[in-house]
């Protein structure tokens, strides 16, 4: 069962270092699911980008974030793997 939790919005960033670690691209998904589970890539972030996080999908125990719902770039929205974000502040 997915544990999706609304969180107080916070700013995070996809850094150049993160992009380099993942071959220069962070995929943005329409849902917090993988392609195998029916998720579709709706965008690809290829440059350092500041995002606003509004929801987090927790692991099966409900404790660790696995994916984050983000808004960025003039109204774009989707889900990214949590490990691809660096929290600001």
Name each model-derived stretch.
Residues 74-84:
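A short macromolecule-binding patch
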Residues 1-34, 38-47, 54-57, 61-64, ...:
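SH3-family beta-barrel domains
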Residues 68-72:
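SH3/SH3-like beta-barrel fold
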Residues 73-74, 89:
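Short strand-coil-strand connectors
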Residues 51-53, 75:
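Hydrophobic/aromatic side chains embedded in well-ordered alpha-helices
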